[in-house]
């Protein structure tokens, strides 16, 4: 198998969203996650941007297809169409902007109404590197996350702190739901698909079959 083919082999594919107000650093989070560097010339997303990456979660290779949505109200009708069938989402606010935090409820309502029924969401308080300019405390956001059954991390797209961890935690919870039977990759609109590696395993005959009479030499 070629190196390219190997790099594209994965067990599952998850559709992810990155949502939240404009200026919270959503595109920078995506760029830091995929490229491992800060995108310092980032402009506001117009409509939707896309990125993908394969990660290892507990020995399973998961390909994340990530849709970075525009935060401006005028693009809301466009970006809502991309919510359908999302398995996971990063809900992002800026810890230095109370306004972006206050908008979280609206974004959360959209995600739970328009995406898949069992969408897994992690709340990300971005721009952790600007702690001296903080307007939203860790405790306040932590309570919001707990009340709304969200995971929660503070992140920094600039330094990379907790960026990969946010995506991995979200993916791990989705995997746990698959293993428990709560999520079915074969159900339409789940935001989850089996990858090539998992399909090969599902389709391969069981190795532990009883030997035939001819083989056993009876």
Swiss-Prot record:
InterPro entries: P-loop_NTPase, Rab4, Rab_GTPases_membrane_traffic, Small_GTP-bd, Small_GTPase. It comes from the Eukaryota. A lipid is attached at residues 216, 218 (S-geranylgeranyl cysteine). Its cofactor is Mg(2+). It catalyses: GTP + H2O = GDP + phosphate + H(+). GO terms for cellular component: early endosome membrane; insulin-responsive compartment; recycling endosome; recycling endosome membrane. It holds the Pfam family Ras. Its EC number is 3.6.5.2. It is found in: Membrane; Cytoplasm; Early endosome membrane; Recycling endosome membrane. Belongs to the small GTPase superfamily. Rab family. This is Ras-related protein Rab-4A. It comes from Bos taurus (Bovine).
